[in-house]
Structure formats: C-alpha cells, structure tokens
Amino acid sequence: MSFFQSSKWSLIAGGITAPSGFKASGVSAGLKPSKKLDLALLVTSPNAQCSGTFTQSFVRAKCINLCLERLSKTAGKVRAVLVNSGHANACTGNRGIDDSLIATRALAEKLDLLEEEVLICSTGVIGEPIPMQKLLKGLDPLVMNLSKEGGSDAAKAILTTDLIEKEIAIEGYLGDRLIRIGGMAKGSGMIHPNMATMLGFLTCDAGLPKDVWDAMIDRVVDCSFNAISVDGDTSTNDSFLAFAQGDILDSQHFNELEIGLKLVSTYLAQSIVRDGEGANCLFEVKVKGTSKIAHAQIIARQICSSCLVKTAIHGCDPNWGRILSAAGSTGIPFSLDEVSIWIGSFQVMSNGQPVEFNRKLVIRYMKEIIKGNNASDEKLIISLVVGRSEIEAIAWGCDLSSEYIHINADYTT
C-alpha cells in the first residue's frame, strides 16, 4: 500500500486485536434480518486508558450519554465495548437508556467487570430500539468467542450499509520497543462527522498518561475522521473510542506514535469515504494560503460536502466554478485575485482568472480515477490556493451518484 511507503510503520495482519492486551469477537444475534454478524465485543487489559470523542449533534442516542458518563466516572479506565448494529437506539425515549443499561449490566456480569467499565455503541436505523431478547441471548456466544483472532469478526459485525469491512493494523519500533496499532470502523452513509467517525475503534499497546492520550486523540480525529464527508449529514450515534495499554512510552517517542495513530485513522477515514453509498470515486481537496489552519479546514471540508462538486466529479465534469463557489460560501475571507485551482496536475484558474486548459485531458484524468486506471494515484486531487501563506489543510469526499438516492430512498422500506 503506497499509503505507508515513506513511513517507519509497516502493515501487519490482525486488525483491532493486533496490539497486545486486546481480544474481540463478533456473532450473529439475529438483530439483522439478513442473519449477518451484528453484535461485536472488544475487551482490553486492566490497565488500558480510553479516550472517546462523540457526535456534536443535539439529537443523539442515549448510549452516547452513557459512554460520556462512564468515561468521566472511571477517568477512562473502561474494559469492554459492546457494539450492536442494525438498530441505532436513538430517539427511543427512556427505553433507549434502559436498554443500554440492561445490556451493559448483563455483559459486565459475564465478564466479571464493574458496570461502569463497560461501554455500548449502537448503529442502524434511527428510532428503532434494540431487540433486547435477541441481544441478551447473543452475549454468551459473544463472550465465549472472545479471542486474539476475533478482530475480523468484530469488524464485520459493526457494519450496516457498508459494502466492505474497514480494519487495519501497523507496527513499528519506537526506540527498542515494537509498538502495534490496530483499528476498525464502520460508515457508508450519513457521513459528515463533527468530532469522529460513525463508529471507530483504535487500539495501541503503548501506555500514555491520560492527558497526553486525550490530547493526542483529539488531534488525530480532527485531521482524519473530521475531514471526511459523504453526504453532509451528521449521525446521532457518531463515536470514536481509542485505547492505549501497556508500559508508559518514553515521551521522546510521543510524536512518532502520533504519526502512526494518524496513519491508521486516516486510512480508516478514507475507507469510509471510498465505501460511500453509491460512490465510485474518492477525491482529496487541498487548500493552502489561509491565515489559520482552521480556515483551510473549513474551506476544504465545504468543497468536499458540496453536492454540486460531488455530482460534477461523478460526471467527470471539470467545472471549477463549483469548487470556487463552495469555497466562497464558507464565510472565510480571501482575495479572489490570489485564487488558483488545479484538478490533478491541470491548472484551471490562476490568480483569479480562468486558464485555458485541455478539457479532454482533464476529463480523461477524471475518468481514469473513477475507473481505477490511473497508475499514479487512486484518488482525484483538487488543489486550491487562496493566499500566500504556507498553511494547508486536506479533506476527503466522494462523488454523488443516482445509486446513493436509490439506497437511501429504500433504506427503511
């Protein structure tokens, strides 16, 4: 994978359970009509430190509140995460929190843990409660199947409309210690996070102080999961949980570890966009020249979220006016006279003026990316310069097709 060619980190097998100190499982509890895997469990060693980021939507599932409460109560010392897919358990009234409490209490008893050491994440159709009898019946096989090799089943069990599993693991030496990082995620539609991904989980076998780990995860999430958009909609259940366990890492290696965490998180975030409902093309937007990094991020993310930009990419239409219009709609000030735009290596605007370009070549470039026939890159690149500074931000999106409409028009019918 070219993603890691310049990194000291190497890809390995194992996914979320590749780091030491973690076990996982995934089973079919009958929560989905398809009988596919729908219940996942991740269990950590006693000394693990958990950091979580969650949806910023005012409409959110009760399991989010429970996770926040327990992370605060335990100072991040949680031991297990239960994930059910197919039912979001959001907007279900008091039953939502009651069911979350019942599920985590039952699991805590089976794992011989305290209730507050168990978290729950739910994903699926909003307004649908969890079929609790099926979930509770599925806990015994879920616990029984816990293993070091269970990461792949867990990655499958958290999926909903996803077409592919999203998991990864890497390893690298930090000093004389071999450190491993694993991750898994789910997401395909309702993707426009304002803190994390739809559901994402990360593990690491290097210990860090709580304040260091929390700050590190905030930065990692901001430049990965917060930088993607499939359809501009933020979920009620967005959750990202990151676990660090093991001997405390020497502080001189913190930066190197953060690079590894960003690699894993960026890979998972891009996988979500690549698997966007009905999507054919992953595209990357680079924005440079703003006075603040936050301004560059806002512009890049707005372009990625624009339906007009997304449909133009789907149709292989090099309509740079849509790119510029999306950038201008953010409220971030910049001088039009300093704006230059590239689609791939083709410049289409320079210092606020249109540039004559070979339209056929640009269209061919766009078609090659969509069909996977471009030898140099697997994603379409849009570059925008809006000023003279070296500040730069990147975001990722996918094209918007008629298939997306079909998938979501029929989602609950």
Curated annotation (Swiss-Prot):
The active site is at residue 197. It comes from the Bacteria. This is Arginine biosynthesis bifunctional protein ArgJ. Coiled coil: none annotated. Catalyzes two activities which are involved in the cyclic version of arginine biosynthesis: the synthesis of N-acetylglutamate from glutamate and acetyl-CoA as the acetyl donor, and of ornithine by transacetylation between N(2)-acetylornithine and glutamate. It is found in: Cytoplasm. InterPro entries: Arg_biosynth_ArgJ (IPR002813), ArgJ-like_dom_sf (IPR016117), ArgJ_beta_C (IPR042195). The record marks 123-124 as: Involved in the stabilization of negative charge on the oxyanion by the formation of the oxyanion hole. The gene is argJ. GO terms for biological process: L-arginine biosynthetic process; ornithine biosynthetic process. It comes from Prochlorococcus marinus (strain SARG / CCMP1375 / SS120). The lineage of its organism: Bacteria, Bacillati, Cyanobacteriota, Cyanophyceae, Synechococcales. It catalyses: N(2)-acetyl-L-ornithine + L-glutamate = N-acetyl-L-glutamate + L-ornithine; L-glutamate + acetyl-CoA = N-acetyl-L-glutamate + CoA + H(+). It is an enzyme of class 2 (transferase). Its EC number is 2.3.1.35, 2.3.1.1.
